């Protein structure tokens, strides 16, 4: 039996660098049954296989038009079915992932880079992009979320529940653990699950972020006293949660002074007007006050991005370029960032960033006065 596996996002997104967990579980399942399994790097290889599994996470990842589900071709993932994506069969869903599925592809990428860079090739720095493939055990301890946010793909469940024991996907030879849980803190068994992670003595992270609104003293004390890997990531999606998030930030700062606290900040969802821009800056100002970093998320509905049709399109771009680069966000106000872009502009007139700022300031001077000159480094904990 020859099984082909296609990670559609790997093929269709040039800079995509994260393993597809479903692909790894399917590979592990079939290898245990003696099948020959291969990660396909071209859709042209489908003909050489008895069965092919194609998984896609992102809705805008392109695939050939002729690819259709059949007895031979099995397709799954949110990229195809959004919130209606069918579950894997239990025997596959709860199988140990094959963490070596991508090994041959990684080695090919290394050899290609060596051939191009020659003596200048630095393998250690080159391999950083593959760290999730090589260093992490990856999986879900819990599944589900009760929030039902309209912008979120996670609509299948209305509660959070234990999904897999850690041992189901934990490889002790790997350096770290990456959790893909939808809303870990929403599970009533969060403390027991956290204790199992701590017991491994391995650094771990929640890639999908954590629900700031559920932070309590006990949760904060538990979270900020572990070997955490990288930034603690939360979400500040709605300005309507401003007072609640403010309260929770105070709790966080009782237990950690770390600046490795980051928030996803959703923009362009409820509207793409001046009020949405103001609401974005209002949230960013609060995060600055508590020395947290933002990551601006411009809303995309499958393949449709409303902000791209907004009169403030250039301002949304500038906002993300400023907010999503910590080295810049920490040192420059929004106005300083726009002025720095203008200083690099080589033709007459204003660059798009400076022009967008000036036009908005002319239209909404009160908002500009309140927020455009705020600087992260001016706030102290």
List each model region and its residues.
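A short, structured N-terminal alpha-helical element that caps or precedes a catalytic domain
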Residues: 1-84
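Canonical Radical SAM [4Fe-4S] cluster-binding loop centered on the CxxxCxxC motif
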Residues: 16-22, 131-168
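Core AdoMet radical
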Residues: 53-57, 153-248, 259-269, 293-297
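Conserved C-terminal portion of the radical SAM core fold
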Residues: 60, 177, 227-232, 240-322, ...
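Radical SAM enzyme core and accessory elements
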Residues: 2-8, 12, 31-42, 47, ...
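Residues that mark the start of a beta-strand
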Residues: 1-4, 36, 135, 148, ...
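Anion (oxyanion) recognition and catalysis
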Residues: 31, 198, 285-289
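Ser/Thr/Gly-rich flexible loops in soluble cytosolic domains mediating phosphotransfer, phosphorylation
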Residues: 73-116
């Amino acid at each position: 039996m020859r099984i082909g596996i296609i990670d559609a996002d790997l093929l269709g997104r040039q800079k995509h660098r994260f393993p597809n967990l479903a692909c790894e579980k399917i590979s592990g399942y079939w290898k245990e049954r003696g099948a020959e399994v291969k990660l396909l790097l071209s859709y042209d290889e489908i003909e050489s296989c008895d069965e092919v599994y194609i998984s896609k996470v992102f809705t805008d990842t392109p695939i050939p038009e002729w690819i259709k589900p059949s007895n031979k071709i099995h397709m799954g993932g949110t990229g195809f079915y959004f919130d209606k994506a069918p579950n894997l069969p239990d025997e596959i869903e709860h199988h140990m992932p094959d963490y070596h599925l991508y090994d041959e592809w990684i080695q090919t990428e290394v050899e290609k880079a060596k051939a191009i860079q020659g003596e200048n090739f630095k393998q250690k720095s080159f391999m950083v992009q593959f760290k999730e493939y090589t260093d992490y055990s990856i999986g879900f301890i819990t599944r589900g979320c009760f929030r039902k946010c309209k912008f979120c793909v996670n609509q299948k469940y209305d509660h959070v529940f234990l999904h897999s024991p850690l041992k189901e996907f934990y490889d002790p030879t790997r350096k770290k653990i990456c959790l893909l849980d939808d809303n870990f803190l929403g599970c009533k068994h969060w403390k027991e699950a956290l204790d199992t992670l701590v017991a491994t003595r391995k650094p771990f992270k929640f890639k999908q972020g954590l629900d700031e609104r559920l932070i309590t003293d006990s949760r904060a004390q538990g979270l900020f006293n572990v070997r955490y890997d990288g930034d603690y990531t939360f979400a500040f999606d709605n300005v309507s949660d401003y007072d609640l998030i403010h309260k929770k930030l105070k709790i966080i700062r009782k237990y950690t002074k770390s600046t490795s606290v980051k928030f996803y900040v959703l923009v362009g969802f409820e509207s793409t007007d001046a009020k949405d821009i103001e609401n974005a800056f209002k949230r960013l100002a609060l995060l600055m006050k508590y020395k947290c970093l933002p990551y601006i998320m411009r809303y995309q509905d499958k393949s449709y991005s409303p902000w791209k049709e907004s009169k403030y399109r250039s301002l949304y771009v500038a906002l993300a370029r400023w907010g999503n680069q910590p080295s810049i966000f920490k040192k420059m106000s929004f106005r300083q960032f726009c002025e720095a872009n203008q200083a690099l502009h080589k033709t007459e007139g204003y660059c798009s960033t400076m022009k967008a700022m000036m036009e908005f300031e002319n239209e909404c001077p009160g908002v500009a006065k309140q927020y455009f000159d705020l600087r992260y480094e001016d706030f102290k904990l």
